[in-house]
Amino acid sequence: MLLVRGGTVVTAEASFRIDILCGDDGEIAAIGPALDIPTGCDVLDAGGLLVMPGGVDPHTRIGPDEQRIAALAPVLLAAGTTTVIECVGGPRGRGMRAAWQDWRRGWRHAVRGGGVDFSAHMVIGQYDGDVARGMAEVTQACGVNSFRLSCGGEMDDTQVMGVIDHAMELGALCALDAHGGLVAAYLRAGLDRAGIDSAEAQVLSCAAPVEGSGIARAIMMAGMLGAPVHVGPVSTRDAVDAITAARLRGQRVSAEVLPRHLVLDGEGDEVFPGCDALPPLRDGAQHAALWGGLASGMLGMSASGAGGDGGLAGEACMPDLAGRMGLLWHHGVRAGRLSAEDFVAMTSANAARAFNIYPRKGAIMVGADADLLLWDAHGAAHVLSSCYGAPVVSGAVVHVVRGGVVAYSATQACVAGGGRHVDRPCFGRDLAPRVRRRAHLAAQG
């Protein structure tokens, strides 16, 4: 058992001074002021620190390479993240359930000493009867409740709507990106012919209106079916406006933003790690809209999008993985844009709610997983010199508890322990008719 005592507990709703007792089963056993120390219980002093739920990263693309997974898991822990939801695909012709089994086997082996919990979005690149059957299998047997796909890419609108509709009937959520598509592909081809490539071509072919219209179209298709939808990453005012309009109509829309799009400027033609990733970096005028979307709750969560653009020693990298917490704290909380409670909502609670693992994750209450981030709110501002753009961060991860065990510490030796797969149950069977009724009411308004 582990008693975390003397800190200020911060949840998405409130802050208060209480102790937290973590049980041997990896769950929170008790909370309250001045808890007694059980016999044989270890004590972790949280004096002067904020105690928050461990971070939930709702969008990573780390991939299946076991060496890379094993190397990045400790980086995630050191950044305050205890749970990731990884995008999982497979070669065409490989069944969805088989692809999930391959992925789970590799990740379970790779993180056995890394301590980060993991779950999956299944990536869909085409839609037919086999895919529909695979969707049913993974939702029923594999703890999957979300599917990630591109709107406007290889799949036409009929296929995209087919996926959304089928997912809805299964009690699953579709997560859509809408940054590429035929418009962006057409523009990119013309830029390639003109000899314009790399970062400049990405920005020009996926301009703000392209992203905004794509996000609006994805939301519209889900709305016509009465389905909830998750969109992102979001990087422009146009996209924020589309999300805001839909939510004000009563549509169930959640959205994510990458920290890079909050602080890094995409002006110029410098080639940088991840410059071919979508969405591209934007000019500084877009930052205010994204911060406004976060502060108002229209953009509910931050994600790292961590994938092939670095994160390991010796690699050039974007700051989203190592700096997800510090960037939001420095430019959000310290700058007065966000509260500490907002910070918790955006780094853990809202993602856990959106993907149906709350309150197991993203909460501090009896019965929740004992995943805790002990944060020094007064940690000095410093530059992430190893990351592109050398952004400034502040605050500091002092300890990370996962499953009731100190998995990372900046001040003492610890053993991370093995990470676990997190089953995400599908939403209730009554969700589809309720949301469809709500969508019809929104459409009438």
Segments (PLM) and residue ranges:
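N-terminal metal-binding scaffold of metallo-dependent hydrolase/deaminase domains
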Residues: 1-38
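Histidine-centered divalent metal-coordination motifs
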Residues: 49, 59-63, 177, 233, ...
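Alpha-helical scaffold segments that flank or form the walls of functional sites
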Residues: 49-50, 65-120, 125-145, 161-169, ...
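Histidine/acidic residue-rich metal-binding segments in metalloenzymes
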Residues: 130-302
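His/Asp/Glu-enriched, well-ordered alpha-helical/loop segment
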Residues: 196-226, 271, 292-301, 305-377
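C-terminal cap of metal-dependent C-N hydrolases
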Residues: 366-423
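Intein/HINT protein-splicing elements and their conserved insertion hotspots or analogous self-processing inserts
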Residues: 410-445
